[in-house]
Structures are given as C-alpha cells and as structure tokens.
Amino acid sequence: MSSTNNRIPMPPRLRRQDGAVRRLGVELEMQGLDIDALSALVAEHVGGEIERVSQYEHVVRGDGAGDWQVELDFAYLKQRGRDADPDDSVLGQLDGAAEELLAAGSRMLVPMEIVTPPLPMNELDRLEALIDRLRDAGARG
C-alpha cells in the first residue's frame, strides 16, 4: 500500500539513510467505545487476534508491523488489572468494590487509547482507514 493521498502530513524524506522506510508509532485517544468494541474493531482491521491482559488492557497480535495495544489510558487501573489476585476476605472484597467504582467513573472521564506498532510511513493509509472505521462505530476525540 502507498499513502499518496493521505491526510497525515509526510516528512520530506520517507526513507532512512540505510534506505529502509521510516516508521511511525501513533497513540489514538478517544471516547465512545469500550475496550471490547475497540479491540474487536482493531483485530478485524489488522487481521489479528485479541489477547486480554486485563479488563483495562488488551493486545491485538498478528499484524506484520507488530502488536497493537488497546487500553484505558489510566496507569493505576492498568497496573491493578495486571496485579489482580482474587481475595475473598472482607478487605479484598472492599478493595475490589473500590476498584470497580473507580473504573466506572474513569470510563466516563478517561479516554480509551489505541497504541500502534511502528508503522511504515508509506502504509499510513491503513491508519487513516482505521480512524474512519472508529468514527463510523461511534468513537469521538
């Protein structure tokens, strides 16, 4: 694929000194879609498979460019999700309830984020097509 008509401004040189195509990693932040919907959309778009790291963090694997991260843009909750260890004690249940309350509020205020792998600059039309699909699905931002 080549990006001759893309909306993303291109630098004057698309190749490095060694002749390889320069790459660009991108973070897209948005509201309007939950992590499951975003992950499914990204996986379908790139032909990948979803790996659920936690309820706040997914990885889409299988794209030749690398892994795509789909996550709630809140480091504290992502770490909590990774460290989750079921605790049936009263304090553990209280802690879990507090996390769920924080997560519910965060989903209304904190954006979801898609982090791309380093994409070849001459293939950024793939990213533009994904952005169009996200908008069509209800993403805002």
Q: What is the meaning of each model-derived region?
A:
Residues 2-140:
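ATP/Mg2+-dependent ligation/transfer catalytic cores
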